[in-house]
Curated annotation (Swiss-Prot):
Family: Belongs to the GatB/GatE family. GatB subfamily.
GO-annotated molecular function: asparaginyl-tRNA synthase (glutamine-hydrolyzing) activity; ATP binding; glutaminyl-tRNA synthase (glutamine-hydrolyzing) activity
Record organism: Tropheryma whipplei (strain TW08/27) (Whipple's bacillus)
Official protein name in the record: Aspartyl/glutamyl-tRNA(Asn/Gln) amidotransferase subunit B
Primary role: Allows the formation of correctly charged Asn-tRNA(Asn) or Gln-tRNA(Gln) through the transamidation of misacylated Asp-tRNA(Asn) or Glu-tRNA(Gln) in organisms which lack either or both of asparaginyl-tRNA or glutaminyl-tRNA synthetases. The reaction takes place in the presence of glutamine and ATP through an activated phospho-Asp-tRNA(Asn) or phospho-Glu-tRNA(Gln).
Amino acid sequence: MSEIVTYEDALKDFEPIIGLEVHVELSTQTKLFSSAPNIAGPLASCASQGPNTLVTPVCLGLPGSLPTVNERAVDYGIALGLALGCSIADELIFARKNYFYPDLPKNYQISQFDSPLAYDGKLEVETESGDVFFVEIERAHLEEDAGKLAHKSSTGRIQGAQYSLIDYNRSGVPLVEIVSRPVFADRCAPQVARAFVELIREIVLSLGVSNARLERGNIRCDANVSLRPRGLGAGILPNRTETKNLNSLRSIERAIRYEIQRQATLISSGELVRQETRHWREDRGITLSGRVKADSHEYRYFPEPDLLPIPIPSDKVEAIRLSMPEHPLALRRRLKAEWKFSDLQFRDVLNSSVLKQVDETVRAGATPDGAKKWWTGEITRIASQRRCNASDLISPEAVAEIELLISKGILNDSLARKVLAAVIDESLSVQQAIEKYDLSLTESASVERVLEKVLSENQEVVQKVISGKTQAVGVLVGSCMKTLGGKADASKLRQTILNRLLPR
């Protein structure tokens, strides 16, 4: 392939069309069709369980084993469907999706085909730049996950592997697959995809139906991309590629952007775009060819003979609807109005993915501005360095306590950052951190003594301030703060010096 065209050049002649398939692992205690502990649920964790220890005959596809449906997983699926604005089916009907792959022990996957659990939904998404798009949702259906392959090669991929290992702990984990209709967002397509998945993550977290950790595979996104020459009929959808298992918001955006550029380069040079699956290489910033993309008829779907259709009563759906928390979109609108934030301020909170944390910090007693300052600033910075979620570092109550101590004059921003670090690094309470490291502000009498000493020792600077060069007061403030070890309120100290040297 010739040198890849720029993103701007790709958009001159082609209109990108994307479609998204988002797989959400449900955090039920047991798997979808067996009593085995769910590796994505509260009874087990990916880090602590050995391979092939969370399995039953059903997970392994052993002859004679029969599936039974996990009712909690169905309830979670209904709640998620409602939150996506979908209609809910009258019956739960499973189907067999037939294909061969080593991580699929039965040689078929129990999924849904022409009768999904939820259908015809719509989500309003807002990109980081503030553009609003509506993404239509074709369906959301229940299915079981496959096992996990570990290829023993230098790249971790099957190419060049001497052998592969299979872990069936993930086999049978309940999934909801959310499938969008084609999205026409032009140049904003990568950002819309990112915002869509981010909103789904907010929704499943608010519902409590998934751990929603992309880096752990609790949410995985497959991105379909095709390019249509501008001016071509609206009903024409060219060959598409499907980039599989994108597991970070950044990867979703970058992979779609790259695929648009790659396809534009191919078409511009007279080559055809193969309808295939592709894999994203984060380290190289490119997609690599996988296998030819199968159409639905090649999976030979047919009704699951071991599971009869299960009625879904309307009163059950309504009961689930009434038990659901406030929708994240409604929450956003309400909090923005209550906090009196500008569009820019509120988008800063959304882009840092800390809306819930800021809300809980405000409810714990902090001001909206104070809560935002900590969660979008220092805490997000530390979380980014450690590659974890900000919510894993510190509780909203602790942040509110720190902010309250600042307002009372017991801490300043510098000392508060040290308290924050101690709380995060050593799992101390706020008071324990203050006492252990003696981090409260110095009493006013001590500050006054230091101030008198600094003024007497810096008469030249004092005269500059008196003569009107007020910027020189920073030297005096700095000397005081150095002597006090930073344990003073610099802004109050500055005002005190100005009041003393420039009396009205």
